[in-house]
Amino acid sequence: FQLILIITLPAQILAKDYYVYCAAESEDEVALIRFDGKKAYVEKRIQVGVWPVEIEGPHGITISPEGDYWYLSMAHGTPYGHLYKYKTGTDEMVDRVELGLFPASMEISNSTGLLYVVNFNLHGSHEEKSTVSIVDPEEMIEIDRVETGVMPHGSRLLNSGMKHYSVAMMSGELFEIDAMRMAVSRKIHTKPINNMKNHGMHNMSHKNAKKMDHSHMMSNSDKKGMAAMGHM
């Protein structure tokens, strides 16, 4: 009888909404998207960053295990990027901390509670090794940087939260970091990708973007304005 009752309940009663934060790197904007099981709706557009007339480039995004806060890496800087902390619900900026060159993908460990974010580093000749920043997301303090390979990207942890993995894009090496020791515990050479150096085209697009006149793209400048500068 209970099974029949559940099946015959109206669909709207059983429906559950899911929410996703989605970053738009070219707009300095994060969209809060609601999915009701059938369709997706943009519930809110959140202007992020503190520079009212510059593109800061929101790249990586993750949410705290409790769902109280969400974190955003801002790739562009002078020259270093930042990690931003926002409150879910109000989506107000709480704090930020400076990291390395072009911080990108990130994830929070279930075991340590720390946040691991790769410093992708699109600058320069792409021959220098970069790092993974380890951040205390409660206090918003960078507590360590672990050197890995050239242009590390991707940031994933085991379900246990004990091992962190990222890939050095220019060499194809997979780096394993011991989350407790905060040190590289293993380096795995993956199969070389054909024409890996063609990734330089991606770099060229970023270089060209930096040379472009963004004035015609600043549709968000009025929205951010000097009020955003108050977060600095």
Question: Where in the sequence are the language-model features?
Answer:
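Bacterial N-terminal signal peptides
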Residues: 1-10
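Predominantly soluble domains enriched in secretory-pathway, periplasmic, or organellar proteins
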Residues: 11-232
